[in-house]
Amino acid sequence: MVKKEMIAMILAGGQGTRLKNLTKKIAKPAVPFGAKYRIIDFTLSNCINSGIDTVGVLTQYRPLSLLKHIGSGIPFDLNRLNGGVVLLSPYVKESEGYWYAGTAHAIFENIDFMNEYDPTYALILSGDHIYKMDYSKMLDFHKEKNANVTIATINVSFEEASRFGILNTNENNMVEEFEEKPKIPKSTKASMGVYIFNYQLLKDTFEELKSKGNNFQDFGHNILPYILKKYSKIFAYEFNGYWKDVGTISTFYEANLDLIKNHKNLDLREKNWTIFTKSSSHSPQYITSGGNVVNSLVANGAKIEGHVSNSVIFENVKIGKNTIIEDSVIMSNAIIGENSFIKKTIIMENTVVKEKMVLNSLNNQSLNEEDGIILYDGKEK
C-alpha cells in the first residue's frame, strides 16, 4: 500500500437508543435525514471534500443498512485502487474476539487496517453528527501548533455542557484540562468528537496502556486524559460552523427543519461542498393542481395533493387531497390519507396515516415523544 499522510476512521456502530424507533432496525448513522440522505453522508462527504481518500467505517450495531448504503464507495467517489472506503466490523482474532467496548477500543481493534497505510496522522470521526467541515484546515492547524492531538471544539450553552467532553484551554488554545461530561462544567468549549492524532503517538499510547493492564475503552475517559498528563501538547481547534449531534428525537427533528431555515453553514446546494449519497431511481416529484408546497424540501418520487409548509418530505411519499402538513418530517414511502392534519410530527418510513387523522401534540398527548414532537409509526399506543 502507498503511504498516506492522513486517513480517516469513522465510528459508525452506535445504537442510538434515544432515537427510539428510528434506530430499532438500523444503526444511528444509517438513519435517513434531510429528504434523501443518511446521517453518515455528512461525515463521509466532509472526508471527500477535504481531500481524504482513505476511510475506514467501523460498524457494529445492525450494520446491514450501512453496508448496503455505502457499498464499494462509488456514490461517494471512494472506490479507489489505493485507499477508498472500507467497512470494518468486529471480528475474532486467533486468541480473542470482542464487540467494541468503546470508541478507543474500536480504533485499537483496527490498527492492522491503519498500519497498511502507515499514516502520519489519524483522523477519528463520529458518523452521527450533522455538519460541514474542512478537515484539511484542521490538519494545517495541527501542524502549525506542532500538536500531538488536536480536538475540534464548538461552543455550547452552559446547560448543554454537561453532555459533552469539556476542554479548558489557555490563550494559545492549548488544552490544560479535559473533563468528560462533567456535572459542573468549567467552560462551554465542547469536544465535537473530531480528533487528529499523530499516529505513532496514538499507537504508543495504546501499547503503553495495554502493557500496564489499563482500560482504554474510550477516548474521552481514557486516551485523552492519559496523553494530556504524559505528553501534553493537545490543542483545541475552534469550529464556528453549524454542528448538531442528532442523538435525540428533538435534535433530529430540529436538524431536519434547520435545512429549510437558510443556515449559511448548512446549505445543501453549496456548489463547492457537495453532500454525496446513494441516489435512488424515483421519478420526479409531482405536485398536483390542488397541491401546494411552501418553504419545504421535497424529494423525488413524492406526490403531493395537499398543502405542505415548513416541512421535509422524503422520497416516494404520498400526501392525499385536502391534507395539511406543517412543521413536520415525513420519511420515505409514507402514505398520508386525505383530509388529515399533521403538525410538528415525524412520520416514520413506510407508515400509513389514515384519512381524517389529526397528529399534533395538543390532540395526541399519548404520542408526545419529546418536547412536543410526535414520532409516529402508524401504531396506536
Swiss-Prot record:
InterPro entries: ADP-Glc_PPase (IPR011831), ADP_Glu_pyroP_CS (IPR005836), GlgC_bac (IPR023049), GlmU/GlgC-like_hexapep (IPR056818), NTP_transferase_dom (IPR005835), Nucleotide-diphossugar_trans (IPR029044), Trimer_LpxA-like_sf (IPR011004). Alpha-D-glucose 1-phosphate binds at Y100, G165, E180, K181, S191. Pfam families: Hexapep_GlmU, NTP_transferase. It catalyses: alpha-D-glucose 1-phosphate + ATP + H(+) = ADP-alpha-D-glucose + diphosphate. Gene3D superfamilies: Hexapeptide repeat proteins, Spore Coat Polysaccharide Biosynthesis Protein SpsA, Chain A. One of its GO terms (biological process) is glycogen biosynthetic process. Pathway: Glycan biosynthesis; glycogen biosynthesis. Homotetramer. Involved in the biosynthesis of ADP-glucose, a building block required for the elongation reactions to produce glycogen. Catalyzes the reaction between ATP and alpha-D-glucose 1-phosphate (G1P) to produce pyrophosphate and ADP-Glc. HAMAP family: GlgC (MF_00624). This is Glucose-1-phosphate adenylyltransferase. It comes from Mycoplasma mobile (strain ATCC 43663 / 163K / NCTC 11711).
